[in-house]
Regions:
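A structural connector/turn signal
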Residues: 47-53, 126, 138, 250-251, ...
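Non-catalytic DNA-recognition/assembly elements of restriction-modification systems
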Residues: 1-20, 138-154, 165-210, 337-373
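Sequence-specific dsDNA recognition surfaces
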Residues: 5-20, 30-63, 198-213, 227-261
Length: 373
């Protein structure tokens, strides 16, 4: 259906700044995927500064814009009559006679909007790039009648419900893989089945990723970064990864190969450190960022599908932390201390076949989830 499009500036105006002072309001945090949430629910505690007097009060149905905006961190406040947010956030009043706050939120978080922000950002440092306010307000927003907006919102809600059910099925399939692994091989750290073990680095080598500069140019190449790991176990289409500009093509040691395993080496989020993914770039030249470590096998004692599950086991991740990795870093010395159980290769291959079949089911669920996204 064709809609009229109007500039965002005709729908929102800057709100009057109201500070928290000594008021008692819930602290709200912005998220990429769920908009505004109660901070104590997101982090299981309030992590805001003890002094929130300078925080901004945001009322129900006001628009909150965070940064970097190209990550979609903006939302209509729809969870409390009033809450407080970081003083760095921008707050706008929405003309509700023209547009429903929830409809506006979806319009400003859609792919077309994100691409607009990315194309218009100014500045040289990635996470400090800003979108000039006049440019933001010039963005064209679809504006059907209010009745049609309500219908669109209802369709989005129904699609989200289907997607959530699909994701539940995917999580159950992940649990099935973990259960099958434990059934066949036991816990890789406790090694109650008494498999022979080998140090991880006796079976392969590690390489830290590339550091590059935003003013480099000349060669465009796909690059695996921390933000691309998500909940993946395998990345097989590296052509879909973001590209970076380099002055020259990286040396072969910085190019990923099929069956490589890449770890998150450094991140502010402890849960991300040590996360691993197997990559299969095929013929697509692909490098990896300096916040990652690449592991490359040179022995067939273990196969990648088995080894990846060993490295993803909770007990193995905990061992990484316990042997020298602090909250934000993993290093090659820590990886060298990991002992890997080596069961018979036929068992590893049986497990790999099982994972392949389960992954086919996961891909089917993901495909249908995308259809309703």
């Amino acid at each position: 259906m064709a809609y009229n499009y109007v500039e965002l500036g005709s729908l929102i105006t800057p709100s009057k700044t109201v500070r928290c002072g000594d008021g008692d309001y819930p602290v709200l945090s912005m998220t990429m995927h769920n908009g505004l949430v109660f901070q104590d629910e997101k982090f299981k505690k309030v992590i805001a500064s003890k002094d929130t007097s300078d925080y901004k009060v945001v009322y129900r149905n006001q628009l909150v814009i965070s940064f970097p905006i190209d990550e979609g961190v903006l939302a209509a406040q729809r969870i409390a009559d009033a809450g407080i947010v970081s003083p760095a956030y921008g707050i706008w009043d929405i003309d509700q006679s023209k547009i429903l706050p929830e409809f506006l939120e979806y319009a400003l978080r859609c792919d077309r909007a994100i691409q607009y922000y990315k194309a218009k950002l100014r500045g040289s440092t990635a996470r400090r790039r800003t979108l000039p306010t006049p440019t933001l307000l010039a963005f064209k927003v679809p504006l059907p009648c209010l009745e049609e907006q309500e219908k669109v919102i209802d369709r989005i809600h129904r699609a989200q419900s289907v997607k959530e059910k699909r994701n539940e099925q995917i999580n159950k399939l992940d649990d099935l893989i973990r259960a099958r692994f434990v059934e066949m091989f036991g816990d890789p750290v406790a090694n109650e089945k008494r498999w022979g073990t080998r140090p991880l680095l006796s079976m392969g080598t590690c390489k830290n990723g590339m550091n590059f500069h935003y003013d480099d140019y000349g060669v465009e190449i796909n690059c695996l970064g921390v933000g691309d790991f998500k909940d993946y176990s395998i990345i097989s289409n590296t052509a879909m990864l973001p590209t970076v500009s380099l002055n020259e093509m990286p040396s072969p040691e910085y190019l990923l190969q099929d069956d490589d395993i890449v770890f998150v080496r450094s991140n502010g989020n402890k849960k991300m450190v040590g996360r691993s993914v197997a990559v299969y770039p095929g013929t697509v030249p692909t490098t990896f960022s300096g916040f990652c470590i690449r592991y490359r096998r040179y022995t067939d004692a273990v196969i990648t599908p088995y080894l990846l599950r060993v490295l993803k086991a909770d007990s193995m991740r905990q061992q990484m932390y316990g042997r020298g990795a602090n909250i934000q870093n993993l290093n090659q010395q820590t990886l060298s201390s990991l002992d890997i159980p080596v069961p018979p290769k036929t068992m590893q291959e049986q497990f790999a076949d099982f994972v392949t079949q389960v992954d086919k089911s996961k891909q089917a669920h993901k495909y249908f989830s995308k259809l309703v996204a």
